[in-house]
């Protein structure tokens, strides 16, 4: 690999603004804001609007749209079509 062309891959904390959850992971993204982690070390923090802690798909609070009504409406409208 060439030296000097790859981004820095370092530990970063992602903070979910909706739920307040924090995740320590590694990333190439960086920030001027920092946070002190549970281990006493200071890491750059990236604020995200939504994560797996607050997204309805992952929390189980998703709404499932009822498409059966639309299918039934379509079938009743076109049941005699082509006969």
From Swiss-Prot:
GO biological process terms, alphabetically, are: translation
**Any one GO MF annotation of this record:** structural constituent of ribosome
Q: Name one Pfam family in it.
A: Ribosomal_L31
Q: How is this protein named in the record?
A: Large ribosomal subunit protein bL31B
Q: Which InterPro entries match?
A: Ribosomal_bL28/bL31-like_sf, Ribosomal_bL31, Ribosomal_bL31_B, Ribosomal_bL31_sf
Sorted keywords for this record are:
Ribonucleoprotein, Ribosomal protein
Q: Which domain of life is it from?
A: Bacteria
Q: Does the keyword Ribonucleoprotein apply?
A: yes
What is the name of the gene encoding this protein?
rpmE2
Look up keyword Ribosomal protein and say if it applies: yes
Matching entries from NCBIfam families are given as:
L31, PRK01678.1
Q: Entry's HAMAP family? A: Ribosomal_bL31_2
Listed under GO cellular component are:
ribonucleoprotein complex; ribosome
Tell me the protein family, please: Belongs to the bacterial ribosomal protein bL31 family. Type B subfamily.
Which segment of the chain is annotated as a signal peptide? none
Q: How does it assemble?
A: Part of the 50S ribosomal subunit.
């Amino acid at each position: 690999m060439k030296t000097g062309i790859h981004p820095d891959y370092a530990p970063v904390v992602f903070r979910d603004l909706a739920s307040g959850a924090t995740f320590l992971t590694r990333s190439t993204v960086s920030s001027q804001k920092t946070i002190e982690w549970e281990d006493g070390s200071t890491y750059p923090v990236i604020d995200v609007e939504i994560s797996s802690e607050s997204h309805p798909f992952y929390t189980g609070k998703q709404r499932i749209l009822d498409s059966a009504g639309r299918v039934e409406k379509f079938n009743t409208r076109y049941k005699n079509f082509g006969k």
